Structure formats: structure tokens, C-alpha cells
Design a protein with these regions (language model features):
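Non-catalytic helical/linker scaffolds that mediate oligomerization, partner binding
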Residues: 1-381
Length: 381
């Protein structure tokens, strides 16, 4: 049976300098999100890189999320170049757009208004927290953005080093409570392999995972060379080993509604059974994100008919997205479809218990209103 173990996602930078083989090796090593830095490269080169990532991901039958990182500037935070880059990124159907030098929620709104004007309001905005003003205005920024990227090395200038770990912990905790995905950039030396990483490197990565980050990102990587493949392998190994030894905190629901109540119930069920996995049906990704916010010990299989949601969910902690080629309407069809998908991918065995979370009826539901404990048919050999 194929194992589904790692829950923390890995982000790495891919550039036009990256070869096809290196991109393939990086995806195989465990890269979930490819960050494309728009400070470098022509549009033709960047388009080719994006096409290569998509092609290889398709061949490997694995989702890879595309994160466009704008060059950004301090004044204004969204420059004329950034506007052109956003338009190009939208033409390439990027999944997330990261904006730097954010000082207030207004900076996020400027980008969101641009996306609205371009008919791309569903494209997620990542707020890079790297300025003291952003830290001071953190809550209002979180109310506007769709995800957060933090890099202690960036906002560490002028701040006492002993405060940085607690600041990172506070930001991650607030994001977890609000249900906002958070990426933690970690410094990894260019010569890093798992055997030669320093204790400080490993400790920083482990702490970010224990704090509850959704993803860890290889910082200061302008190109994906062989060393980035080794860096991804290191992050995957540290994440897998850390997750096996800790119990994540369950975050209290940010809202009091049916969907939030069901997501809270997941943890109680998981601790008693536990199930093999949680299967969620989602058209927007909302249900899967709520389930992930509870930090269950078992993987979340997010089934969606929407290719954009399929890719974007690959950033979310603990979520394994699956793209559906057909939609179902009845409860019986839904259950049968879950079994078929999980069996085909060798994620379950006969007799395994799973949790199904969805909105019934599937095509007309106004939200998640259904949770079922289901036993996979058949007998164990």
C-alpha cells in the first residue's frame, strides 16, 4: 500500500536556468510548489519554464502549484513592472501571486483590485511579511490576503535576534487561527545536504514545522541546480521525521457554523479510530482548508473537479489533491467514487476506515453539511 506520510509542503524556486532533468528531479524529490521569481528572465523564458513544469508534473501525475513572486518595490509596493508581470502571470494561469514590501492591508487591496479588473479575482494573493510596518499591521493584512510568506532573515534587520523565533511563532499561530496558509522561508547553505546541514539549519526548519507552518521554502535560491534537489530532499526528510514525533495543536474555529463544527469533529473521530485518511469533496477548496486547519494526524484527500483548485490546494498542509474527471450527484455515487480513487492509487486496503466530508447533494449544496465514517469494502488478505 502506498504511504501518505508528509504533511508539511515544500516550496522551491525554479528559474529559466533550470534544466528539464533538474525540474523533474526536484518534483520527484518532493517539491510541491514551484516559485517563479519575476525579478529575472524574459517573458519567453519564463513561459517556457512554466510550460516545462506543467508538462513534467503531468507526466508524473502529480500536482505542482505555481507561485509567481513579483519583484515588488517599496514605493509603490506594486510598480508598473509588477502590473505587467501580473498580466503575464495571469496569461500563464499561475495559482498564487506573492507581493513583497507590504506595509498595510491597502497594498494587498491594490493587487486584489487589479486582479478583479482582469477578471481573475479567484487568483490567490500571498503577502510577504518582511517589513516592520507589516508586522505592526499584521491582523488587517491577514484579513485581506489569501496566504502569507514569512522570512525571519528579512525582518530581522534592526530587530534583536532573540525576538525572531517568537515573532515567527506568533505570525504562524495567527495564520493558523484564521485558516490562512503560511509559507516559512528557511535559509539553507548552498553546500547543504542532509548530512552536512548545521544544527542551526535543522533547528530552524524543525521549529517552523512545529509552529504549524503549511510549507517550508528554500530561501535565497535564484536557480534550481543539483543543490536545490538536495535541499528539497533535506526538507522532506526533516519534515517527515518531525511530524512523526509531534502532536500538532488543534486551532479553535474562527467561525461558528456547520462547516467549522464538522471540521472540529474530525479530530475527535481521528483520535478514537483512527481512520486511514479524510476524503473531502470541494469545488472551491474551502472544505479541505478547514479540515487541514484542525491538523489531523491522517492525510486529507481533497477531491475537486476544478483544475485551479486542484493545483492551489497543493500548498495546504496535509492536503493531497485529486482532480476529478466526473462529478457525481447521489450519496451512493459519491461513496463509490471515493473508494474507486483510493483503491486505484493504493492509498487504502479492504477494511480500512475513512472519513468522508462533503456537501449533499453534491451539485446543489450550499456548503459542507455531511460527515461519514466509511469502511472500505472487502477483507484483508
Amino acid at each position: 500500500m502506498q504511504q501518505l506520510t508528509r504533511q508539511t509542503k515544500v516550496v522551491a524556486t525554479v528559474s529559466p536556468a533550470s534544466s528539464l532533468q533538474t525540474i523533474a528531479d526536484t518534483i520527484k524529490a518532493g517539491m510541491n510548489v514551484a516559485c517563479i521569481n519575476f525579478s529575472h528572465g524574459s517573458y519567453d523564458d519564463l513561459a517556457q519554464t512554466i510550460a516545462q513544469i506543467r508538462s513534467i508534473a503531468g507526466e508524473l501525475d502529480t500536482p505542482v502549484t505555481l507561485l509567481q513572486e513579483l519583484q515588488s518595490s517599496e514605493l509603490p509596493s506594486l510598480s508598473n513592472k509588477d502590473v505587467r508581470d501580473v498580466e503575464f502571470g495571469l496569461s500563464q494561469e499561475v495559482d498564487y501571486i506573492a507581493l513583497g514590501f507590504i506595509k498595510s492591508a491597502e497594498d494587498v487591496r491594490v493587487l486584489k483590485n487589479l486582479l478583479q479588473q482582469k477578471g481573475a479575482a479567484d487568483t490567490a494573493v500571498v503577502a510577504k511579511i518582511e517589513k516592520h510596518d507589516a508586522i505592526a499591521n499584521l491582523e488587517e493584512i491577514l484579513d485581506e490576503c489569501d496566504a502569507v510568506m514569512i522570512a525571519p532573515s528579512d525582518f530581522g534587520v534592526g530587530m534583536s535576534q532573540e525576538k525572531l523565533p517568537l515573532l515567527q511563532q506568533r505570525i504562524i499561530a495567527l495564520c493558523n487561527h484564521k485558516g490562512i496558509p503560511v509559507i516559512s522561508a528557511v535559509q539553507v547553505p548552498e553546500s547543504t545536504t542532509h548530512k552536512h546541514s548545521t544544527r542551526a539549519d535543522t533547528s530552524d526548519i524543525t521549529k517552523a514545522i512545529m509552529d504549524g507552518t503549511d510549507a517550508i521554502m528554500l530561501a535565497s535560491q535564484s536557480e534550481v541546480k543539483e543543490i536545490s534537489v538536495k535541499g528539497v530532499q533535506m526538507l522532506v526528510q526533516i519534515a517527515t521525521e518531525t511530524e512523526a514525533e509531534i502532536e500538532f495543536l488543534n486551532n479553535p474555529p474562527a467561525k461558528t457554523d456547520v462547516t467549522h463544527a464538522l471540521s472540529v469533529g474530525l479530530n475527535a473521530i481521528c483520535k478514537v479510530l483512527p481512520p486511514r485518511c479524510i476524503a473531502t469533496f470541494t469545488s472551491s477548496g474551502y472544505t479541505a482548508r478547514l479540515a487541514a486547519g484542525e491538523r489531523p494526524k491522517v492525510p486529507i484527500i481533497a477531491l475537486t473537479p476544478n483544475p485551479k483548485v486542484y493545483r492551489s490546494l497543493n500548498l495546504i498542509w496535509g492536503v493531497q489533491p485529486v482532480l476529478l474527471n466526473r462529478e457525481v450527484e447521489t450519496f451512493e455515487e459519491l461513496t463509490a467514487q471515493v473508494e474507486e480513487i483510493l483503491r486505484d492509487r493504493s492509498w487504502v486496503e479492504p477494511g480500512d476506515k475513512i472519513i468522508i466530508m462533503a456537501g449533499i447533494p453534491t451539485k446543489h449544496s450550499q456548503g459542507t453539511n455531511f460527515l461519514k465514517i466509511h469502511t472500505i469494502a472487502g477483507n484483508r488478505e
